[in-house]
Structures are given as C-alpha cells and as structure tokens.
Amino acid sequence: MKFFLKESKVEKHGRQHLEKVMECYLKFEELMEAFYRGDCRLVSELTKEIAIKEHEADEIRRKMELEFYEGAFLPFDREDRIMLVESIDKVADVIESAAFTVSLGKVAFPAEFRDDFRAMMKVTGKTIRALHECVESLETDLGEAMRKVHEIERFEDEADIIERKIITGLYSAYRQDRIGVVKFLDMKEITRKVANISDRAEDASDRALIIIAKRRG
C-alpha cells in the first residue's frame, strides 16, 4: 500500500510541476506584451513573478526527486520519469532566462518587428500547451501523447522559421541604420532566448517519446 501511496504523491506533484511551468509561460506572454508597449515597470514586475514561479517549480521538482529516491515507481520506469521532469523543468528555466534578458536590456521595442514577435510567441504558446497535453496523456492515452509529440515537432520547426526571419530582419535594419548596434544585439539575444523555449519543449517531448516507446513495447 505504501508503494502506491508514493506513486500517487509523485503523480500529484508532477501535475503541480507541469502547472507551474505553464504559469511561467502565461506570465511571459504578459511580459512580452508589456515589452511591446515599452512598459519597463511592468516588465520588471512580471520578471520577478516568473522568477518566483520558476523557484516554486524547482521546489516541486526536488520533492519529486526525493520521492523517486524513496522508491516511487519501478526502477525501469523511474529513470525515464526523472528525466522527463528535469526536461520540463528546463522549460521554466529558459522562460525565466528570456524574461530576465528582456528586463535587463530595457531596450525600446522596434515596432516593425511586433507582428513577427507575436507570431513567434503564438507558436511558442502552442508548443507549451501541446507539451502540457502530451504529458497529461501519458497516463491515459499513449496515442494522443504521440500525436502531441508530432505537433510539438511541427510547432518547433515553425518557431525556427520565424526566428530566422526576425534575425534576418534585424541584420537588415542594422545595416540600413534603422536600429543601432546596442538595440540590434539586445534584440537578437531576446529573439534567440524566446526561440529557445520551443527548443526545450521539444527536448521534453523527446523524453516523453521514450516513455511512449517503452510502454508500447
């Protein structure tokens, strides 16, 4: 009985951890809208809120690691679950890093890139939501989890295309003296940080894929 109680507890913490990562991203969406408007005060406040949520996600992850160490789940399943949790946690890490980069630079957002950034944020949001649904489906519907893995791959490819478009545009704007060197470098770094969110989400989905493959035998 105690063994199953451990599994129930770690599954509960897994859901909580996933929700915290989702909350980090939702706050980051708010932050980017504030960034477009030039609201540095709100960007700073939201960065702090994201840092708190990322810390809370870390605390939940540590609890889960202790529960795994104490024997939750069978050994053949335990390692894959630990790796999945760590991969999901890295998504929160890169969200916090992107938020900090935006907040630190205090760069005035160049309006000509607003539509492309919103497009990248939209597809990044789809990637994060698909990851959330993928992980939830691991316990209920492996076929649906697999479909979400493929969705994440497509979304990450879309994010890469938009990232390249933005960076190409930034180089063009810099060469034509529409933006200065400091803004160019800051915006390029921010672009890469935002794109990195989808990259880490795809990494987490790769861990989910391993679990799916093993369970299907």
From Swiss-Prot:
<dbReference type="InterPro" id="IPR002727">
    <property type="entry name" value="DUF47"/>
</dbReference>
<dbReference type="InterPro" id="IPR018445">
    <property type="entry name" value="Put_Phosphate_transp_reg"/>
</dbReference>
<dbReference type="InterPro" id="IPR038078">
    <property type="entry name" value="PhoU-like_sf"/>
</dbReference>
<protein>
    <recommendedName>
        <fullName>UPF0111 protein MTH_1689</fullName>
    </recommendedName>
</protein>
<comment type="similarity">
    <text>Belongs to the UPF0111 family.</text>
</comment>
<dbReference type="Pfam" id="PF01865">
    <property type="entry name" value="PhoU_div"/>
</dbReference>
